[in-house]
Structure formats: C-alpha cells, structure tokens
From Swiss-Prot:
Stored HAMAP family: Malate_dehydrog_2
Gene3D superfamilies hit by this protein: Lactate dehydrogenase/glycoside hydrolase, family 4, C-terminal (3.90.110.10), NAD(P)-binding Rossmann-like Domain (3.40.50.720)
Leading EC class: oxidoreductase
UniProt-listed InterPro entries: L-lactate/malate_DH (IPR001557), Lactate/malate_DH_C (IPR022383), Lactate/malate_DH_N (IPR001236), Lactate_DH/Glyco_Ohase_4_C (IPR015955), Malate_DH_AS (IPR001252), Malate_DH_type2 (IPR010945), NAD(P)-bd_dom_sf (IPR036291)
Species assigned in the record: Cellvibrio japonicus (strain Ueda107)
Keywords attached to this entry: NAD, Oxidoreductase, Tricarboxylic acid cycle
Binding residue positions for NAD(+): 11-17, 105, 112, 129-131
A Pfam match: Ldh_1_N
Phylogenetic placement of the source organism: Bacteria, Pseudomonadati, Pseudomonadota, Gammaproteobacteria, Cellvibrionales
Family: Belongs to the LDH/MDH superfamily. MDH type 2 family.
Name of the protein in question: Malate dehydrogenase
Amino acid sequence: MKAPVRVTVTGAAGQISYSLLFRIAAGDMLGKDQPVILQLLEITPALKALQGVAMELDDCAFPLLAGIVTTDDPSVAFKDSDYALLVGARPRGPGMERKDLLAANAAIFSVQGKAINDHASKNIKVLVVGNPANTNALIAQRNAPDISPRQFTAMTRLDHNRALSQLATKTGTSINNITKALIWGNHSSTQYPDLHNTLVDGKPALSLVDQAWYESDYIPTVQQRGAAIIAARGASSAASAANAAINHIRDWALGTPANDWVSMGVYSDGSYGIEKGLIYSFPCVCKNGDWEIVQGLDINEFSRAKMTATEKELQEERDAVKELLPA
C-alpha cells in the first residue's frame, strides 16, 4: 500500500463537501490503492456540524481513510497538504453587488493562498470550486508566490460534463462515444461551450446537429445550467459539482484518456491570444501529474468573439479586486 497523501477540503461541512468527502475516502479520486488523510477546514460556527461529518466518515470504515483532521485554522488545514479542494466560498446574499461578492471572496482566498504558500507541500495541486472560481483561484495563486502558478486550477469540469450530457441527449448516443468537448473561459454564463472539435462516434459533432440548435439552444443551455438547477432544486448544484471536482483531480493526478482532452481553468501562458496570467478554461491533457494546454486548434470568427467576451469578464473580475492582489 502507498503512503497516505493529505487532502485538504475547505467548506467541509457544506453541501458540496457532503457529496465529495465520502467519495474521496472511498478512493474515487486518487485510486483504490491510495490512502488519504482528510484535512477539513470550516468557519468556527460550522465546526460542530463538521464534527458530525467526521463521525460519519469514521462510521463508513473506509480502508483508505488513514486519518481526519477538523479545524478552523488554515495553517493546520493546509499543513503538508498534497491536494487542496477549495470548496468554501461566500455565497451571494440579497442585494449584494457582484463587486461585493468578489471582495468578500478575495479576503477568504488571499488568506488560504498564504496558508498554502507557508504550510502546504510545494508540489500541492489546488482546485478552486467555490465561486467565482476562476478569480478566486487567481487570488489564491497570487498570494502563494513560492508555489508554481501551474498548481492552481479552477473547476470548469462541471460545465464540460454538462456539455457532454446535452450533446449525448441530442444525438442519442452514449457519453462514452463523445470526445473533445470543450469549455473556454470563465465558469460563468459567459463561458463558451465549443463543439468545433468535438467528435461523436468519431464524426464531427457539428455535422450531426444544426447550427441553429448549437447557437441558440446548446450554448445557452450549458451556460445557464447552474441557474436552471437552482430554479428546479431550490439550491445550487452539489452532487454534480462534487463529481466534477473528483473528475478534475483524478485526471490531473492519474492522466487523461488517449485521444481526448478535458476542460480545466488554468494559468494562461498566452495560448490562443488569451492574456497571460488569467485563470482561463482551456482544453488540457494531463500526464505524470501535470497538465498542458492543447495547441493548434483552429479558431474561427464565431469562436474568437465568444472567447474574447469571456476573457473580458475575467479581466473585469481581476480589476475589481486589483488592490487585494499582491504585485
């Protein structure tokens, strides 16, 4: 059996984490031969509820669960951490402007970025789930100068999975037969679900669906799926978000399938003309615990306009919290 790895989860008593932690402990994220120590962070008022979650984890008697730490102290939660899933974030309250939400989360993620910098393994892999995920990831990354910016990612895998599901339903095929689905940009309603390179049973997806459906049905459905779930369920996506987080880390740690890619919010190196330093969703392949952006895709005018629109939103979000970002 391998030595245990330390997995930090923030917002650990929340809805997403309740769907996430048991699957991590069962080996769904890092494999059935990888023991884990869960290091669970919550705000002080939620520590009692977190204790209850820890009791339930104990009661599952998971063979791979080598230990549990519960704390409200980031320096304890991130100590020697190998993986961190930053799930906890300030939700948008009534009458709250977007810039207020950005500022409230900037305070949270700057503290966590510093704690990661000072206490975590230098090889840590960080996934930000809490929204606004891309900009929260940027804030954490900028507050961790001793950690490579490549180690901070944001989750667009839920959007990617939604895109797969919508296309599978439309074409009457199994999700297993679809490759190269793609989300560009921000995890928000400006994201661009791009089918120009997607294959269904090896055939170009856009040869199987009409352009009108693609532009006026598929794209807005994927963009607005989160809001549709809130309207239906009375609460935001939790189990599907947890599932996507597991998919994201598993592929990053263990590798993506041959002849396919995944969508990941990663540090832009200027690929496809996207401003360097933004956390932007690109097509990525992973192997040996590292990711790289797929290069050489043709970008037509339609795609370029959509990619630029979501880039602009990310620039605006960054500029709104500029004074909170270290130089």
